[in-house]
Amino acid sequence: MRLDLNYGRDSYPLELRDDWDVTVIRKPAMPLQPDPSLAVRNALAQPVGASSLANEARGLKSACILICDITRPVPNGLLLPEIVRQLLDAGMNPDDITVLVATGLHRPNEGAELEELVGDPWVLKTVRVVNHFARDDAAHVDLGRTPRGTPVKLDRRFVDADLKIATGLVEPHFMAGYSGGRKVIAPGVAHRDTITTFHSARFMAHPKADNCILEGNPLHEEQLEIVRMLGHMLAVNTVIDEHRRLSFVNYGEIIASHLQAVEFTQRYARVPVGRRFKTVVTSAAGYPLDKTYYQTVKGMVGPVDIL
């Protein structure tokens, strides 16, 4: 038997002997959007817990759009052109629109890598695209502390924007339950003091800081506290299949829209297996998810429960 695992930009061929007892575990096939661009436009016009993007932007002077860094395969080239066009149509000046790469404590994305990340040359030419730097003290606003004592310091460019939009990918996350939404803000554009506090053992060692768990997950709950300290924010959430094709997109108030995206993706994220295995062969799902050793760890922790 031959199987191909997603690996790097291509795949890794795996030859399995016929006399081996092999179980192939796949998640259910996800529905695909036949016209991804139309799906994005429809999402921006049909909000969850908010007004349409055009209405939200009307009369406001500035906007900051968060995008994940190169370690996440978010379809930015699909999302950003439509978001930026609608902000311009609402009367915003291009100089007052910032696309902020939510690097967390990762390195900045620059040059050809930034072009690949943004996915559209018109966006790069039209609005300002910049990286977040978590170690730059002066670039952050101190909003105080959460009830758990986490210091909340966030990128000034996001905090000061009239319209705040987080874009991202919603999928299982081995600490925060699910990625996307509030996670793009913290740790995405948080100061190192904020990130290192809730990435500490006090949070990460909690039994509910795990894949597919939101209720009782201290990381998720801390992220929600931080979001609430900022006030009204919007999000564009995507779900993609294993071939990076768009399956789901929505837009709206950041918490409500994220929960709707979680509800969709959890139908496909969990696969009942019913037994444990001595050996599991898997991958980190290919580029860019296996671009760094840290991200590759996610491929290791995924099958832990069936070993």
At which residue positions do the language-model features occur?
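Membrane-embedded hairpin module used as a gating/binding unit in multi-pass transport
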Residues: D210-P288
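Short internal beta-strands
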Residues: D95-L105, N237, L307
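Short glycine-rich or small-residue beta-strand-to-loop segments that form or flank ligand, phosphate
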Residues: S62-P73, T98-G104, V281-S283
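An acidic, phosphate/nucleotide-engaging active-site surface
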Residues: N109-Y178
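Conserved phosphate- and dinucleotide-binding cores of soluble alpha/beta proteins
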Residues: T146, L154-D241
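Glycine-rich phosphate/diphosphate-binding loops that line cofactor/substrate pockets in enzymes
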Residues: V48-C64, D89-D95, V271-T279
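N-terminal amphipathic/basic leader segments beginning at the initiator methionine
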Residues: M1-L44
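C-terminal catalytic subdomain
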Residues: D290-L307
